[in-house]
Swiss-Prot record:
Its EC number is 3.6.5.3. It comes from Yersinia pestis. The keyword Glycoprotein does not apply. It is an enzyme of class 3 (hydrolase). Residues 10-204 form the tr-type G domain. Residues 19-26 are annotated as: G1. This is Elongation factor Tu-A. GO terms for molecular function: GTP binding; GTPase activity; guanosine tetraphosphate binding; translation elongation factor activity. Residues 136-139 are annotated as: G4. Keywords: Cytoplasm, Elongation factor, GTP-binding, Hydrolase, Magnesium, Metal-binding, Nucleotide-binding, Protein biosynthesis. The gene is tufA. Monomer.
């Protein structure tokens, strides 16, 4: 069928609904699929289909997440919605569902609530780049001034967390009325979809980013030199290009003298491919798993960073007891564990299994990192937490 082929050429954008419990995130998700299917074609998803979210595992953590898809004339969207607050926290920290932008749902009847604030903060910490506000349940508020007040409050809250609160789009609607087919409220869903298209820029594809390959294995091939293997995380490496080996030890430059995949020689290795890269003038013992191969100057090694972390509950196979300052677990980045120490926020004495917490980590070896890098926290090979680098410090 020709339609299927056409769909694949559209830009693909990942979004999700965030916000306080019972403010209508799942109802809005259902309304978007329903109204867009009716307007532009595609399939609608009912509330109970979305609310009954399947379990997934990401970095050893079980998360309930619903994925729906919908189309505007310009784009194809993959949209994630979580049933419970804990699922949002886990989802955002593990990066199980990366969001190019989020729809913050705030009930006009309540205004911003504690989880509204927490989701905005998490969005800031884990690097959700754009937020669009959907003020829900506006059919239940007759007072125009009250709506103005709620909108102002939400904008101020977003500004407080470094989002452009004064400039970002706010749509006033009613997900339930739109779902029930009332035309004036359906129009608000179309307005929201228009903002998804115009306000969230098309994400940069992995292949267009600077080259990076996390090293999984190192071999010595007599007469040819040293080969490192791994899956190209982003970008392209071409034969003859200069690369840097970053992390754990001092950064070293080399040249890629060959790329191979399944024993065949290639001119280049691209994002998503498992390749072997032959390096000039590098000894087998100069390089190890856990380092990365990268475009020169594109990534630096760091030891200290601020992080947002979720600690597994006992039921999830995590610790049975809290930990305190001075805790020294392993931090698993990409392909290797590095021991690190932690610094808890002022006034926090201990962290319980099932908590999420902001903490400063200092590693004993530097690791190639940027803000937004995900990691696992492990004790003797067992995952006890997941985290994200919120801000590199040193």
């Amino acid at each position: 069928m020709s339609k299927e082929k056409f769909e694949r050429t559209k830009p693909h954008v990942n979004v999700g609904t965030i916000g306080h419990v019972d403010h209508g995130k799942t109802t809005l998700t259902a309304a978007i699929t329903t109204v867009l299917a009716k307007t532009y074609g595609g399939s609608a998803r009912a509330f109970d289909q979305i609310d009954n979210a399947p379990e997934e595992k990401a970095r050893g953590i079980t998360i309930n997440t619903s994925h729906v898809e919908y189309d505007t004339p310009a784009r194809h969207y993959a949209h994630v919605d979580c049933p419970g607050h804990a699922d949002y926290v886990k989802n955002m920290i593990t990066g199980a569902a990366q969001m190019d932008g989020a729809i913050l749902v705030v009930a006009a009847t309540d205004g911003p609530m504690p989880q509204t604030r927490e989701h905005i903060l998490l969005g800031r910490q884990v690097g959700v780049p754009y937020i669009i506000v959907f003020m829900n349940k506006c059919d239940m508020v007759d007072d125009e001034e009250l709506l103005e007040l709620v909108e102002m409050e939400v904008r101020e809250l977003l500004s407080a967390y470094d989002f452009p609160g004064d400039d970002l789009p706010v749509v006033r609607g009613s997900a339930l009325k739109a779902l029930e087919g009332e035309a004036e409220w359906e129009a608000k869903i179309i307005e929201l979809a228009g903002y998804l298209d115009s306000y969230i820029p098309e994400p940069e594809r992995a292949i267009d980013k600077p080259f990076l390959l996390p090293i999984e294995d190192v071999f010595s091939i007599s007469g040819r030199g040293t080969v490192v293997t791994g899956r190209v995380e982003r970008g392209i490496v071409k034969v003859g290009e200069e690369v840097e080996i970053v992390g754990i030890k001092d950064t070293v430059k080399s040249t890629c003298t060959g790329v191979e995949m399944f024993r065949k020689l290639l001119d280049e290795g691209r994002a998503g491919e498992n390749v072997g890269v032959l390096l000039r003038g590098i000894k087998r013992e100069d390089i190890e798993r856990g380092q990365v191969l990268a475009k020169p100057g594109s990534i630096k090694p760091h030891t200290t960073f601020e992080s947002e972390v979720y600690i597994l509950s006992k039921d999830e196979g995590g610790r049975h007891t809290p930990f305190f300052k001075g805790y020294r677990p392993q931090f698993y980045f990409r392909t290797t564990d590095v021991t690190g120490t932690i610094e808890l926020p002022e006034g926090v004495e201990m962290v319980m299994p099932g908590d999420n917490i902001n903490m400063i980590v200092t590693l004993i070896h530097p690791i190639a990192m940027d803000d937004g890098l995900r990691f696992a926290i492990r004790e003797g090979g067992r995952t006890v937490g997941a985290g994200v680098v919120a801000k590199v410090i040193a």
